[in-house]
């Protein structure tokens, strides 16, 4: 049984960024909310869109920060502090350059790997890196100088389909995480081939 109380999907705000690769974490939280029959609503107190869902009898908050990516910690910190949610009770979903579209993996802890959203969350959680992550593969442009344009760009239809397919599987694996445990959820998701 999971101890997760907060699931966060990282994104940049506004229509301009809604369909960009950098928003893959938000797409996951939006799909999880839809499957749970919840509506994400703007909440200025937490600088984001929030919802409250029940996953296998457990009360869980969903959050998509409405701050820009590099300020995601402001939103996560505000909600976590208010509800006294510890870092190890948080799952942050984010785009991952080092994995191909169609691949997603759960992970506990670790650094930020250059991801500015994770970097700010770690800073706002008093440098505690001990939260869970859902890494959603978006692929890499092949040139580090192209990364910014790449993550802020829209994926071609074939890649977008792979990302959406693995997000669907990640939602099913999240349900398994709450019904069973992290090991079974990881096995299912990590075995998936999109």
Curated annotation (Swiss-Prot):
InterPro entries: Pept_tRNA_hydro, Pept_tRNA_hydro_CS, Pept_tRNA_hydro_sf. CDD domains: PTH. TRNA binds at residues 17, 68, 70, 116. It is found in: Cytoplasm. The record marks 12 as: Discriminates between blocked and unblocked aminoacyl-tRNA. It catalyses: an N-acyl-L-alpha-aminoacyl-tRNA + H2O = an N-acyl-L-amino acid + a tRNA + H(+). It comes from the Bacteria. It is an enzyme of class 3 (hydrolase). GO terms for molecular function: peptidyl-tRNA hydrolase activity; tRNA binding. Signal peptide: none annotated. Its EC number is 3.1.1.29. The keyword RNA-binding applies. Keywords: Cytoplasm, Hydrolase, RNA-binding, tRNA-binding. The record marks 95 as: Stabilizes the basic form of H active site to accept a proton. GO terms for cellular component: cytoplasm. The keyword tRNA-binding applies. The active site is at 22 (proton acceptor). Belongs to the PTH family. Hydrolyzes ribosome-free peptidyl-tRNAs (with 1 or more amino acids incorporated), which drop off the ribosome during protein synthesis, or as a result of ribosome stalling. NCBIfam families: pth. Monomer. This is Peptidyl-tRNA hydrolase. The lineage of its organism: Bacteria, Pseudomonadati, Pseudomonadota, Gammaproteobacteria, Alteromonadales.
């Amino acid at each position: 049984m999971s101890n997760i109380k907060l699931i966060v999907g990282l994104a940049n705000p506004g229509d301009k960024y809604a369909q960009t690769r950098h928003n893959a974490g938000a797409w996951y939280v939006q799909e999880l909310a839809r499957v749970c029959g919840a509506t994400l609503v703007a909440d200025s107190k937490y600088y984001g869109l929030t919802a409250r869902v029940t996953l296998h009898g457990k009360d869980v908050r969903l959050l998509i920060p409405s701050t820009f990516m590099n300020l995601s910690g402001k939103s996560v910190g505000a909600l976590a502090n208010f509800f006294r949610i510890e870092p190890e009770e948080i799952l942050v979903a984010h785009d991952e350059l080092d994995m191909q579209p169609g691949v997603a993996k759960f992970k506990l802890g670790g650094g930020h790997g250059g991801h500015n959203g994770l970097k700010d969350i770690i800073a706002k959680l008093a440098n505690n890196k001990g939260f869970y992550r859902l890494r959603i593969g978006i692929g890499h442009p092949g040139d580090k100088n192209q990364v910014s344009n790449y993550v802020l760009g829209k994926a071609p239809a074939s890649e977008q389909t792979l990302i959406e397919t693995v997000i669907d599987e990640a939602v099913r694996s999240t349900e398994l995480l709450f019904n069973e445990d992290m090991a079974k959820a990881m096995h299912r998701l990590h075995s998936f081939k999109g």
